[in-house]
């Protein structure tokens, strides 16, 4: 007889290697074929809804690790909710209008000027949809479960129709208006930009000090006195209409080299050296309020520049007197309106000077900086020029500087409902908590929202103009356009004449001849995505508004979180979301932003081909995503190592329950040994902790909890000593079936707990566990937290034992290093204990030699009895010696009773007994 044939060794079809890049697509094809997404929705019919609303990624370019981070977090949440008693449909979306798509089309060599706007827009739509298809494939390969056949896409007619309704409702409430005021203008995009489309970068600029001569001092200043201003935008001097001083600041008149100058008193010490005023004497001090309406002359144009009082003039920098060009700045515009100044902005859409700036016509504004400075020097008005580096607004798409430029634009008035917005922010639950402060401050401080764009690819502003120039936005026109867009798409606006866009028989008092024109501007893309609560949540029967969760990157406080809040509060009076969760950015291993120029980009598609989607997903679960996260080949290697441990744990569990039938072989909880109960209690604790962590969206905690359970509780303890039972004992022995009961429970529980994070691997485990025809793991619910008898008492006892076991392990390790023993199975452990530890061991049930994975064990009361050579710790001393006896050929334990059965001279008594009873015919 071959004794090895009597061992019950593990058997499983679950492979050691995941081979994820090849296996995952097979599971995905199966899920698609079986309509798994639909089955999950059916299973959860009638359950309480939990709606995570997808913030639409922009349909341009390859997926990056930020996309993978974002979509995986969402998928983990939706999968968790779907297994936790909720109905959680997930409708993915795409943002498809805007400049990058226009630019991409232009790069293909399309001659835009040689085709109609409608034709150009068709090309944009085709391009956007190919991008959507490419990204959809990438997201599906990542294992994201959703309604991929019916996503929401902002260019679809049904979406655009609802967006028009949002605009119409806001207009009806008086929130939409047209006005000329300075807006962020991007010469590189030839369009106005919203605050959300601005990013700040360092820029080197000319900083100049300029003297404006007083022509009418109102009895306060002598004629010819110079008021000194400071600016970092010399190109705006041709648009200067005034100077602003603070009414509550003191200003001094100083005399230097026969000239008089006015600056803020508080800034004089800085300016003495900077402007060469070291020897200047103070002639008089005046209050800013006294300087109001004094008249100065523009340095090189024959026009006045009025001195005004404004709070935005401060003594923090410069001279305390602010150059004011109402056409090129927010504060300048407001004070210019107050003092009835001309709103002059002498630039065209490309940032080139018009004939309203004599001497600079046809010059690009940035080029004009040098010319203006030279002109000021020529007329003797330039006191000083230097270069500074400062934070300056840039177009987030083109990365080029933007300017403030007064143009006629359409706005959404924030002032009209700002208090409602702030109240709504307070009513939302924010994670991280600082998100509330961030958005609250943004809403509190923001100006009106410029919603018009001078571009082609977007949703047209549904506005008509009468013959007298009056803008027409009525319920009748809005409803008509909404239905036209629903039927034909928004391109109909550019394909048809005005008369074919208006309702039949439409008349208006401002058009006695029945003539109308239409607006040619489109809406800001943030209005597109910001309308999704109406176009998706409100429009789809399976979804609800407000959503339970909006979850995006932290850049969306100024973007989608903001625009969605604005449109939703405007038309419904409440926020479109109950909870908002934000994540950081994906950086490289050294914490740098990923960029092609640095050569440090890591693309999810490439990682999935090499390692598999489940590794990317496990990486997402491993990081503290609320801050910026790091990813690199080295980090993914570490994650792969954890994956390997989890997989090996599952393989061991599966291999050792191959002959276990849960229906007939399960040992009831009360009939388990204490150590088995202890493991089920630990497993139950894991269920509670993991479910709590899922609920709090703390996936990195789950990663550590499960990794720790697999490594410490299972691999290093329970599964390790189990081999002496499940391989060696008779198939149906109570101890073996008890351990298999725990293994089975652990396999089922871990598979369910990991399913939202590792959908492919857990499906593979589940198939192996349940067998052919198994219903998908993703149609199961998460395990319940159980009430287990005596759990506190058992846990306290066995936790204390585990601490002592740690000391025994250290002693064995020491003995191995000292070459006292080879494998631990050759050892005898003599444990010297104090009274407390003795009481503990007396109360424990178990074969301690087996639990310590040694051949012999002796317990001795009295620490004082331990020899000098013993390994000592606070409660115990451990003496390691070589076990006496022979090694049993079958179980490899050193026993004194090897050969007790003469028919089996190489077996110990236990093994001989098993062989005789179960394997001898």
From Swiss-Prot:
The keyword Repeat appears for this protein: no
Coarse class of the protein's main subcellular location: cytoplasm
Cysteines joined through disulfide linkages: none
Keywords: Aminoacyl-tRNA synthetase, ATP-binding, Cytoplasm, Ligase, Metal-binding, Nucleotide-binding, Protein biosynthesis, Zinc
EC number: 6.1.1.5
Cofactor binding note: Binds 1 zinc ion per subunit.
Domain observations: IleRS has two distinct active sites: one for aminoacylation and one for editing. The misactivated valine is translocated from the active site to the editing site, which sterically excludes the correctly activated isoleucine. The single editing site contains two valyl binding pockets, one specific for each substrate (Val-AMP or Val-tRNA(Ile)).
Family membership noted in the UniProt record: Belongs to the class-I aminoacyl-tRNA synthetase family. IleS type 1 subfamily.
Quaternary structure, from the entry: Monomer.
NCBIfam families (alphabetical): ileS
Protein name: Isoleucine--tRNA ligase
Organism: Listeria welshimeri serovar 6b (strain ATCC 35897 / DSM 20650 / CCUG 15529 / CIP 8149 / NCTC 11857 / SLCC 5334 / V8)
């Amino acid at each position: 007889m071959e004794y090895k044939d009597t061992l019950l060794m593990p058997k499983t079809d679950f492979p050691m290697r995941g081979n994820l890049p090849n296996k995952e697509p097979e599971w995905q094809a199966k899920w698609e074929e079986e309509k798994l997404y639909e089955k999950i929705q059916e299973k959860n019919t009638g359950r309480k809804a939990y709606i995570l609303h997808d913030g639409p990624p922009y349909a341009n370019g390859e997926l990056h690790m930020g996309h993978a981070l974002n979509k995986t977090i969402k998928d983990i949440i939706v999968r968790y909710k779907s297994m936790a008693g909720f109905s959680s449909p997930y409708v993915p979306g795409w943002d498809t209008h805007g400049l990058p798509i226009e630019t991409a089309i232009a790069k293909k060599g399309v001659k835009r000027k040689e085709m109609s706007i409608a034709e150009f827009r068709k090309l944009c739509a085709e391009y956007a949809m190919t991008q959507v298809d490419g990204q959809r494939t990438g997201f599906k390969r990542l294992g994201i479960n959703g309604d991929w056949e019916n996503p929401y896409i902002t260019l679809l007619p049904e979406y655009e129709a609802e967006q028009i309704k949002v605009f119409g409702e806001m207009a009806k409430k008086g929130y939409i208006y047209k006005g000329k005021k300075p807006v962020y203008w991007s010469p590189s995009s030839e369009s106005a930009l919203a605050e959300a489309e601005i990013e700040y970068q360092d820029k080197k600029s000319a900083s100049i000090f300029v003297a404006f001569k007083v022509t009418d001092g109102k009895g306060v200043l002598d004629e010819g006195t110079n008021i000194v201003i400071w600016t970092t935008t010399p190109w705006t001097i041709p648009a200067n209409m005034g100077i602003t001083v603070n009414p509550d600041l003191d200003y001094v008149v100083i005399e230097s080299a026969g000239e008089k100058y006015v600056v803020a008193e508080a800034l004089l010490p800085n300016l003495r050296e900077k402007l060469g005023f070291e020897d200047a004497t103070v002639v008089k001090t005046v209050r800013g309020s006294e300087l109001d309406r004094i008249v100065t002359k523009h340095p090189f144009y024959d026009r006045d520049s009025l001195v005004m009082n404004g709070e935005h003039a401060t003594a923090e920098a410069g001279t305390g007197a602010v150059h004011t060009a109402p056409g090129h700045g927010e504060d300048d515009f407001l004070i210019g309106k107050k003092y009835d100044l001309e709103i002059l902005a002498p630039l065209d859409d490309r940032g080139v000077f018009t004939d309203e700036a004599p001497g600079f016509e046809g010059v690009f504004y940035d080029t004009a900086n040098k010319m203006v400075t030279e002109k000021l020097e020529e007329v003797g008005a330039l006191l000083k020029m230097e270069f500074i580096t400062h934070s300056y607004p840039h177009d987030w798409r083109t990365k080029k500087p933007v300017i403030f430029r007064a143009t006629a634009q359409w706005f959404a008035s924030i002032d009209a409902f700002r208090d409602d917005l702030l109240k709504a922010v307070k009513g939302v639950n924010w994670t991280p908590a600082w998100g509330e402060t961030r958005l609250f401050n943004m809403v509190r401080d923001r100006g009106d929202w410029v919603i018009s764009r001078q571009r082609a690819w977007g949703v047209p502003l549904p506005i008509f103009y009468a013959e007298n120039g009056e803008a027409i936005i009525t319920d009748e026109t809005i409803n008509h356009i909404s239905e036209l867009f629903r039927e034909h798409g928004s391109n109909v606006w550019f394909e048809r004449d005005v008369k074919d866009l208006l309702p039949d028989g439409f008349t208006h008092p401002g058009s006695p001849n029945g003539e109308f024109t239409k607006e040619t501007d489109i809406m800001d893309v943030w209005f597109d995505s910001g309308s999704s609560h109406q176009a998706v949540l409100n429009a789809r029967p399976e979804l609800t508004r407000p959503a339970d969760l909006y979850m995006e990157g932290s850049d969306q406080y100024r973007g989608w979180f903001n625009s969605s809040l604005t449109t939703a509060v405007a038309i419904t009076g409440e926020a479109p979301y109950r909870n908002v969760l934000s994540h950081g950015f994906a950086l490289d291993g050294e914490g740098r932003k990923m960029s092609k120029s640095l050569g440090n980009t890591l693309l999810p598609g490439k990682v999935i081909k090499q390692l598999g989607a489940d590794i990317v997903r496990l990486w997402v679960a491993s990081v503290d995503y609320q801050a910026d996260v790091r990813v690199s080949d080295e980090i993914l290697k570490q994650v792969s190592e954890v994956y390997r441990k989890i997989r090996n744990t599952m393989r061991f569990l599966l291999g050792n329950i191959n002959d276990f039938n849960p229906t007939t072989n399960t040992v009831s909880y009360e009939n388990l040994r204490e150590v088995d109960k202890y493991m089920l209690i630990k497993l139950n604790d894991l269920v509670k902790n993991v479910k709590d962590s899922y609920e709090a969206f703390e996936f990195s905690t789950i990663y550590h909890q499960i990794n720790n359970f697999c490594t410490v509780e299972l691999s290093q303890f329970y599964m390790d000593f189990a081999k002496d039972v499940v391989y060696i004992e008779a198939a149906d022995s109570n101890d073996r079936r008890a351990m298999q009961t725990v293994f089975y429970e652990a396999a089922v529980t871990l598979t369910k707990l990991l399913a939202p994070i590792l959908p492919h691997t857990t499906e593979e485990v589940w198939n192996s566990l349940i067998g052919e025809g198994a219903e998908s793991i993703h149609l199961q619910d998460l395990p319940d937290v159980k009430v287990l008898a005596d759990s506190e008492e058992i846990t306290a006892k066995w936790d204390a034992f585990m601490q002592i076991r740690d000391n025994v392990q250290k002693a064995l390790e020491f003995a191995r290093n000292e070459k006292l023993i080879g494998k631990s199975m050759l050892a005898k452990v003599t444990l010297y204990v104090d009274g407390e530890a003795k009481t503990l061991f007396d109360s424990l049930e178990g074969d301690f030699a087996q639990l310590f994975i040694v051949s012999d064990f002796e317990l001795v009361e009295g620490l004082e009895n331990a020899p000098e050579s013993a390994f000592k710790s606070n409660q115990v001393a451990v003496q390691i010696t070589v076990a006496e006896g022979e090694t049993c050929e079958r179980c490899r334990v050193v026993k004194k009773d090897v050969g007790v059965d003469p028919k089996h001279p190489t077996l110990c008594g236990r093994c001989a007994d098993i062989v005789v009873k179960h394997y001898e015919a």
